[in-house]
Curated annotation (Swiss-Prot):
Its EC number is 5.6.1.7. Belongs to the chaperonin (HSP60) family. GO terms for biological process: protein refolding. Pfam families: Cpn60_TCP1. It catalyses: ATP + H2O + a folded polypeptide = ADP + phosphate + an unfolded polypeptide. The gene is groEL2. It is found in: Cytoplasm. The keyword Chaperone applies. This is Chaperonin GroEL 2.
Length: 540
């Protein structure tokens, strides 16, 4: 094992503090409406310009190993906040630095770090209660647009687009953000269920110009296994032909004789039919087929539950008003499933989302939920250059995730105001505590003003003066850094999602308290690389 360097007590804490401050200084310049951009060099391609705190934090790696430990711990604050709430990463970083710096001063003066930690944790519980008490549910489209606008760095166009997307796909719908191909940012909404499987043969196309197969008022056969022999589906085909309606076959695969016969009948006899592979794999495929069955009001034909393809009747088929298939994807519009059955299935999926511990599984379940009850909205981000597009995409991502958080837990007055309104409650708690626990609560009370002070400083104002003014104001009043005025934050549309504020606080305290209780740090001794050998002389 390689030898290690070890640092103890104050020496260790000062090294960590330097790393924390270095990372925080790079991140906090992005906070607020007048926050600045950070340019990140890339080993390939053009530099990345961003105003997204977590993107900046993720790029920071310090040369000094001990300082880097502090930086990496605060990077974790930003990442965790981004994962949970989707925004608030810069706020979390600013809070973590303020709490750690303030706490370190007290530890240096002889305070017990463990008692400070206990005091801080008690204060967090009080602050979270205060935030929840002040939180307002998001009721109208205007508030959704305002939350998105603030998160997108006051870009009203993005805010409006996200509000429009939520209005169209509903609160359970999915909004995805992709790079566009033009200058304009566009919203594309897909109603109904869409999955990434296309027709199995180009001969199924009904429109050769658009290369689509469009089936109106169609029956849908949903089968769990492969279909190879045509004799398995002949009775069902005859029954469907008699109704004069088209048939869409969704199965694990349609191959060989079955596919060839369907194609020949499509071309020669004008049979209105199309076959497509089922979406997903394994258990997820089975679940998605069941979703399609519920959406279309049909049954999943599965031998596991005793249903055979040869004995399937027309009553067991699903129905859709319209099915649109391209070579890559299928969209089912207006299935005949009952609202009660669809909502019941949606509740099941929501329970699975709550119980799941895997982020990947949660994401896939959320996609299924959106396809079942809402729809999918895609925002195509447009810009003149690739650099601008990446910067804008970061902002749209932030706005979209902040909006989802606002819909989930409600909103608070923004601009750091919500934290200021919690200070009296924390001071009351501190009065009921003793010793270093009391000091821990006082540290939290002082640190809560850090985001507001930073927003003011980024706007070119004196943070302490702005703080003094805001403390004397009414509950919802605060400082609008964009205009330099004191306003009613809710009326002015300066809002923060409660979930974002809460997660930023909880993650900041968690890491800052852990760092405060650190007494020793251990790192590898840096290897000294030998100097390169001198080139061989060329004299003959």
């Amino acid at each position: 094992m390689a030898a290690k360097i070890i640092k103890f007590k104050e020496d260790a804490r000062q090294k960590i503090l330097k790393g924390v401050r270095t990372l925080a200084d790079a991140v906090k310049v992005t906070l607020g409406p007048k926050g600045r951009n950070v340019v990140i060099d890339k080993s390939y391609g053009t530099p990345h310009i961003t105003k997204d705190g977590v993107t900046v934090a993720k790029e920071i790696e310090l040369e000094d190993k001990f300082e880097n430990m502090g930086a990496q711990m605060v990077k974790e604050v930003a990442s965790k906040t981004a994962d949970k709430a989707g925004d608030g990463t810069t706020t979390a970083t600013v809070l973590a630095e303020a709490i750690y710096s303030e706490g370190l001063r007290n530890v240096a003066a002889g305070a017990n770090p463990l008692d400070l930690k206990r005091g801080m944790e008690k204060a967090v519980k009080v602050i979270v209660q205060e935030l929840k008490k002040r939180s307002k549910t998001v009721d109208d489209r205007n508030e959704i647009a305002q939350v998105a606008t603030i998160s997108a760095n006051n870009d009203a166009e993005i805010g409006e687009m996200i509000a429009q997307a939520i209005e169209k796909v509903g609160r359970d719908g999915t909004i995805t953000v992709e790079e566009g191909k033009g200058f304009e940012t566009e919203l594309d909404v897909v109603k109904g269920m869409k999955f990434d499987r296309g027709y199995l043969s180009a001969y199924f196309m009904t429109n050769s110009e658009s290369q689509e197969c469009i089936l109106e008022d169609a029956y849908v056969l949903i089968y769990e296994k492969k279909i190879s022999a045509i004799k398995e589906i002949i009775p069902l085909l005859q029954a469907v032909v008699e109704t004069g309606r088209p048939l869409l076959i969704i199965a694990e695969d349609v191959e060989g004789e079955a596919l060839a016969t369907l194609v020949v009948n499509r071309l020669r006899a004008g049979l209105k039919v199309c076959a497509v592979k089922a979406p997903g794999f394994g258990d997820r495929r089975k679940a998605m087929l069941q979703d399609i069955a519920i959406l279309t009001g049909g049954e999943l034909i599965s031998e596991e539950i005793g249903l055979k393809l040869e004995t399937t009747t027309i009553e067991q088929l699903g129905r859709v008003k319209k099915a649109v298939l391209t070579k890559d994807e299928t969209t089912l519009v207006e299935g005949a499933g009952t609202k009660a059955a669809i909502l019941d299935r949606a509740s099941q999926i929501k329970r699975q989302i709550e119980e799941s511990t895997s982020d990947y599984d949660k994401e896939k379940l959320q996609e299924r939920l959106a396809k079942l009850v809402g729809g999918v909205a895609v925002i195509h981000v447009g810009a003149a250059t690739e650099i601008e597009m990446k910067e804008k995409k970061d902002r749209v991502d932030d706005a979209q995730r902040a909006t989802a958080a606002a819909v989930e837990e409600g909103i608070l007055p923004g601009g750091g105001t919500a934290f200021i309104r919690c200070i009296p409650a924390v001071n009351s708690l501190a009065d009921s505590l003793e010793g270093d626990e009391k000091t821990g609560a006082k540290i939290m009370a002082r640190s809560l003003s850090a985001p507001l002070r930073q927003i003011a400083e980024n706007a070119g104002q004196e943070g302490a003066i702005i703080l003094q003014a805001v403390e004397k104001m009414k509950e919802k009043e605060g400082y609008n850094a964009l205009t330099g005025e004191y306003v009613d934050m809710i009326t002015a549309g300066i809002l923060d999602p409660t979930k974002v504020v809460r997660c930023a606080l909880e993650n900041a305290v968690s890491v800052a308290a852990m760092l405060l209780t650190t007494e020793a740090i251990v790192a590898d001794i840096p290897e000294e690389k030998p100097a390169p050998a001198a080139p061989v002389g060329m004299d003959y």
